[in-house]
Amino acid sequence: MEDCLHTSSENLSKLVSWAHSHGTICSLIPNLKHLLSEGSHGNLTAMWGCSAGHAYHWPLTATCRAGSQERVCFQDNRSFNSDSPSIIGVPSETQTSPVERYPGRPVKAKLDCNRTRDSCDFSYCSEPSELDETVEEYEDENTLFDMVCESSVTDEDSDFEPQTQRPQSIARKRPGVVPSSLHSSSQTQMVDECSNDVIIKKIKQEIPEDYYIVANAELTGGVDGPALSLTQMAKPKPQTHAGPSCVGSAKLIPHVTSAISTELDPHGMSASPSVISRPIVQKTARVSLASPNRGPPGTHGTNQQVAMQMPVSTSHPNKQISIPLSALQLPGQDEQVASEEFLSHLPSQVSSCEVALSPSVNTEPEVSSSQQQPPVAPAITTEATAQCIPAYSTKLNKFPVFNINDDLNDLCTSAVSPNTTKATRYALNVWRYWCMTNGLKDHTDITKIPAVKLNELLENFYVTVKKSDGSDFLATSLHAIRRGLDRILKNAGVGFSITSSTFSSSTKKLKEKLWVLSKAGMSGARSRNIVYFSLSDEEEMWQAGCLGDDSPITLLSTVVKYNSQYLNMRTLQEHADLMYGDIELLKDPQNQPYFARTDSVKRESRSGSTRVCHGKIYHEHSRGHKQCPYCLLYKYMYIHRPPTQMEAKSPFYLTARKEATDMGSVWYEEQRMGLRSLRGIVPNLAKKVKLENCENFTFVSFTQVSRRLGSHSCCQ
């Protein structure tokens, strides 16, 4: 054998690298075992190994070839527990052919077999599942050799050679092994129907083709840097079939398959019935190989590894197989630091997204084909990211924002206030998220739902809608969402409003939910130490021009003040729900006009209810007509208001126009005033007169005036 050991310095360097790598995982000294021919290429491969089962196929030069030869290998029933220079071959029950020798070679006690093993430059190494266990614990000693992984010492410039393997071994012993096709390579596999063997032809690496996938990809960290951990579940025992069957076709996660898959021949893999029906005793293999670039522990960047966790047996579910990252590295990937960082972060995202959405995960890797595929990092970017990341983004417990450009987003845009636009889009996102999580994707466009159907959906929506973290909305937030949806319908011109009597049943559900939230302390009202305005404070507001009818803002602030004082409106919700028809201009028995809050719009759904006054506003000219509550309210309701907003069901508080010139008599937009702006009116008044703790001033902070008629008195 020594006469044939002619090799190049490069291959010798690779052997030394493997020996160093082997020394990091095993204390036994490897020695030369036997020689294998390389098929059509004719190059020899010397196999080095130790008694623990670690093996390395060392390529030799063409000078060792002594004529045409056929590949000869040992039987699968072999043992690595001997330190002898050769491997003991044990004939199997299925082989009766005598021992054949290499033509023109000395006999080395090699046995022919009907199944050959690949000895390409990707060196296969194998070891027992546990070093403290004997190999005899396996039912078949060939199961020990079936547990193989791809070494890294000859990965970078290797040529692939034909190999013959049992499909049962592939599916049973290597369900999750990621092949060297992750190196920017392409692999084609062919099926040889003769003797039910599968011949796998590996071609020189060019571009990344297809990749095996494994379930539950997640990111782990180790001593050598970040590592990609790919977890594969145990494969169930194959069933006996009467004819050739396809092994390893169970479907796995679809999203990751598109980015990481391996291509099989269309004919599939066939196996003999006798091979499939043979009893199987599965063990968990644990093999660790070091990278050829491995240096001292302090070196960083060359020691990144990919750990593949493949529980093959239920008895040892925690055993792992580790594969160095260099075995999965693209040519020239050392310069692509950004791509490596991306790959180190993406798998955990793919895993968390896919596992959470998949009710069950099969245990066989999905094998699919893709003829043209970009490099690995772009493939994962365009495939896994696009399919796994949902169409909306989230920040902690913030509600999702859908990244959809459509007409509904345009309907949310407000030319009056950016806060209104933000609140309307928020309401739209809440509705879309609720539809998607409740199997109602066809109803995400609220403008295309008929009124009757929308009323039914809203009945369920008000009761079941939650935040993205599963908690309930505050009562004020639920009100704002309802107003936002109604604003979208109005801008779309659908011809109905969700606050109308057509939606009475859904409105009833909303009130019930608001009552529950209020009882649970989730009304949304701020807990404040209420501070009251003094008479001098109010006088200062008049003198500073904060109150009056000089501008849209001052007139609106004055109306809010008088409604709070005279019409008994003390909460933000009462002001927000106020409609134009809820305040009526009436006359008393003395024929004196006055404004009264009758809530006539709210009473439409109440049959037989009598008119009740919650307060009255009369003419009061003791301090001049510029401070008369009746005159100022009249101006707001009948002079400076848009004519289209003088209907009974129009919102009472409108957004003030910002243009100081060319406003004419109309000072307000045809749009409801936002909650935030309405809530800030009173604190802003306190701020303008330089009072402390401005946020503690509310609608009840105004001085309560005496009324000619008590509250809740009947109107004539």
Swiss-Prot record:
Positions of transmembrane segments: none
What are the start and end residues of every segment in region (Disordered)?
84-103, 153-189
Q: List the disulfide bonds.
A: none
Record-linked Pfam families: DUF3504
Where are the Phosphoserine residues found in this chain? S97
Q: Keywords, A to Z?
A: Isopeptide bond, Phosphoprotein, Ubl conjugation
Q: Where is this cross-link: Glycyl lysine isopeptide (Lys-Gly) (interchain with G-Cter in SUMO2)?
A: K201, K204, K237, K283, K626
Q: Which InterPro entries match?
A: DUF3504 (IPR021893), KIAA1958 (IPR042838)
Q: What is this protein called?
A: Uncharacterized protein KIAA1958
Q: Which organism is it from?
A: Homo sapiens (Human)
